[in-house]
A protein has these predicted regions:
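N-terminal Rossmann NAD(P)H-binding glycine-rich loop of SDR-like oxidoreductase domains
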Residues: 4-26
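Flexible, glycine-rich beta-alpha linker
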Residues: 139-157
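A conserved pocket-lining segment of Rossmann-fold NAD(P)-dependent short-chain dehydrogenase/reductase
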Residues: 160-171
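SDR active-site strand-loop-helix element
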Residues: 9, 33, 73, 94-100, ...
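NAD(P)-cofactor binding segment of oxidoreductase domains
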Residues: 60-106, 118-129
Length: 171
């Protein structure tokens, strides 16, 4: 493998499962973080289970294992808890996945959906402020919908219905 290193939060997410092999194929050494324990011997990927407290990740190992490039696929509102760790790792650039729900859910009839928009907005603002303070380059990607590989129940059911019926009824 090359000397290029990238840290990935949310590595077991749908996007993570698709992205990690592509990173390795492109010559990156990946340090993959997940809340779940992952027992894998994928070449080019070092798995790390995120502890309940981000403080447990801020040890001396961060300072000896410099990682300049980061990708966050985890819910953006947990990312600020890991800002100190990213600084210790020597982060220089970070790509973060958020959501267009920051705009579309603020007027939702669902209280749960409505509460998502301010969480996204607050986290994006904190990312922008932290990046300005630390000089870390950042970009936020806001997809409308992420689905595929049979992992999204609603989309999977729709696809199965279309395959079975040959059409999708719209009411």
């Amino acid at each position: 493998m090359g000397n290029k290193k990238v840290g990935v939060f949310g590595a077991t997410s749908l996007v993570g499962r698709c992205l990690l092999p592509l990173l390795v194929k492109s010559g990156w050494n990946v340090k993959a973080y997940s809340r779940r324990e992952v027992n894998s011997t994928d070449p080019g990927i070092q798995w790390v289970q995120i502890p309940k407290s981000p403080d447990d990740l801020h040890g001396p190992a961060c300072e000896s294992d410099q990682i300049s490039f980061w990708i966050s696929l985890a819910p953006i509102w947990i990312l600020p808890d890991y800002f100190p760790m990213l600084v210790k790792y020597g982060a220089r650039r970070i790509v973060v996945v958020s959501s267009t729900s920051i705009f579309t859910k603020s007027h939702s009839g669902s209280a749960e959906e409505k509460s998502t928009a301010p969480k996204l907005s607050t986290a994006e603002t904190r990312l922008e402020q932290w990046s300005a303070e630390t000089g870390i380059e950042w970009i936020v990607l806001r997809p409308t919908l992420i689905y595929g590989r049979g992992m999204d129940k609603n989309i999977t059911e729709i696809v199965q219905m279309i395959r079975r019926l040959g059409f999708f009824p719209l009411l």
